[in-house]
From Swiss-Prot:
TM region positions: none
Phosphoprotein recorded as keyword: no
Protein name: Ribosomal RNA small subunit methyltransferase G
Highest classification ranks of the organism: Bacteria, Bacillati, Cyanobacteriota, Cyanophyceae, Gloeobacterales
Any Pfam family the entry gives: GidB
Species the sequence originates in: Gloeobacter violaceus (strain ATCC 29082 / PCC 7421)
Compartment(s) of residence: Cytoplasm
Family: Belongs to the methyltransferase superfamily. RNA methyltransferase RsmG family.
Record-level Gene Ontology MF annotations: rRNA (guanine-N7-)-methyltransferase activity
Signal peptide: none
Chain positions covered by the region annotation Disordered: 224-251
C-alpha cells in the first residue's frame, strides 16, 4: 500500500515538504534505532501505518483547530508529537519524556527536520504539571502507549486549559476502563466526550481514541508525586482486576 492511500483515509494530503519530512523522519528513526532501541516498528509500511497514520488519526476531530498549543506526554521516539508538528506547522508542539537519551534524539530530529514549531523537554509529567509555565497552559494533551487510561488522565489534565482536551491513544477499550476513567475525571476536572473507534488501513487493527474535555480546574494536588498515579490509580474499582488494555504498539 503506498503512503498516498494512507492519507486518503485521513481526508488530508501532505504537501511536498511535509512528504519529504516524513521520509526523513523514517530515515532518522531507523538510524537512531541502531543506538537507542527506539522502536520495534521498522518496516516501511508498518511505520507509515502505526507511527504516522495512527499519530495523526488520533487528532482527526481537531484538524481544523487554529494554532493550538499541544503537549505530547511520554513521547518516547517522538510519537505522536513529531508527525503532528510536521502535519500542522501552525501548531505549537511540546514533546516530553523522562528518558534523557530519547529527548536528545527528539531534539536532534527537530533540528534535522527544521521544525520551528516544536520543542522537547526532559522531565516527568508529575513534576512539570506543577510548574507555572506548564500548568493549564495547553489546548491539547496527547498520550500514546503510556499507562492505564485513568493514570493517563491524571498526567494529562493538569496541563490542559479550561475548555481544552486530552486525547488518549488506546488499543482495545473495555467497559471497566471507561468506568474507572470517568471516576478519575471527576477529581481532575474532566469529562469523557468521545470514544472514537477506528481501524488502521493496512493491518485492520482496531484503535480507540478517547477524548476528555477539561471542564473545571481540578484539585491542585494532581498529578500526585511520581509513582503514586500508577501504584494507586484514581478511580480504580476496589477488588476489580486491573485492566491490561492492549495499547498502541510502544514506540
Amino acid at each position: 500500500m503506498d503512503s498516498g492511500a494512507l492519507w486518503q483515509d485521513l481526508g488530508w494530503q501532505p504537501d511536498t515538504l511535509q512528504a519529504r519530512s516524513f521520509e526523513r523522519l523514517y530515515a532518522l528513526v531507523l538510524a537512531g534505532n541502531t543506538r537507542l532501541n527506539l522502536t520495534r516498528i521498522t518496516g516501511r509500511e508498518e511505520f507509515w501505518e502505526k507511527h504516522l497514520f495512527d499519530s495523526l488519526r488520533g487528532l482527526a476531530a481537531f484538524q481544523d483547530q487554529k494554532e493550538p498549543s499541544l503537549i505530547d506526554i511520554g513521547t518516547g521516539a517522538g510519537f505522536p508529537g513529531l508527525p503532528i508538528a510536521i502535519a500542522h506547522p501552525d501548531w505549537y508542539v511540546v514533546l516530553v519524556d523522562s528518558v534523557r537519551k530519547k529527548i536528545a534524539f527528539v531534539l536532534s530530529t527537530i533540528q534535522a527536520l527544521g521544525l520551528t514549531n516544536a520543542q522537547a523537554l526532559t522531565g516527568r509529567a508529575e513534576d512539570l504539571a506543577h510548574r507555572r509555565e506548564h500548568r493549564e497552559s495547553y489546548d491539547l494533551a496527547v498520550l500514546r502507549a503510556v499507562a492505564q487510561a485513568n493514570v493517563c488522565a491524571e498526567y494529562a489534565l493538569p496541563f490542559v486549559k479550561l475548555g481544552g482536551a486530552a486525547v488518549l491513544y488506546r488499543g482495545n477499550w473495555e467497559v471497566q476502563e471507561e468506568v474507572e476513567l470517568a471516576r478519575a475525571c471527576r477529581a481532575l476536572g474532566g469529562e469523557i466526550v468521545e470514544v472514537d473507534a477506528f481501524e488502521l488501513p493496512v493491518s485492520r487493527a482496531v484503535r480507540h481514541c478517547v477524548v476528555i474535555r477539561k471542564t473545571g480546574p481540578g484539585l491542585r494536588v494532581f498529578p500526585r508525586p511520581a509513582g503514586l498515579p500508577t501504584q494507586h490509580p484514581l478511580g480504580a474499582i476496589e477488588g476489580a482486576p486491573r485492566v491490561e488494555s492492549e495499547e498502541p504498539e510502544e514506540p
